[in-house]
């Protein structure tokens, strides 16, 4: 296993996981707010 796929000391899979989780959380909060009725105020 080589280390060429990493940027600095942070593995790409960790960056992807964190970014994906944050994106899913934002989408979930947005749809939840829209469902409850607070989405129009964002």
Swiss-Prot record:
Coiled coil: none annotated. It is a single-pass membrane protein. One of its GO terms (biological process) is photosynthesis. It is found in: Plastid, Chloroplast thylakoid membrane. The chain crosses the membrane at residues 10-30. Its main location: plastid. GO terms for cellular component: chloroplast thylakoid membrane; photosystem II reaction center. Belongs to the PsbJ family. This is Photosystem II reaction center protein J. It comes from Chlorella vulgaris.
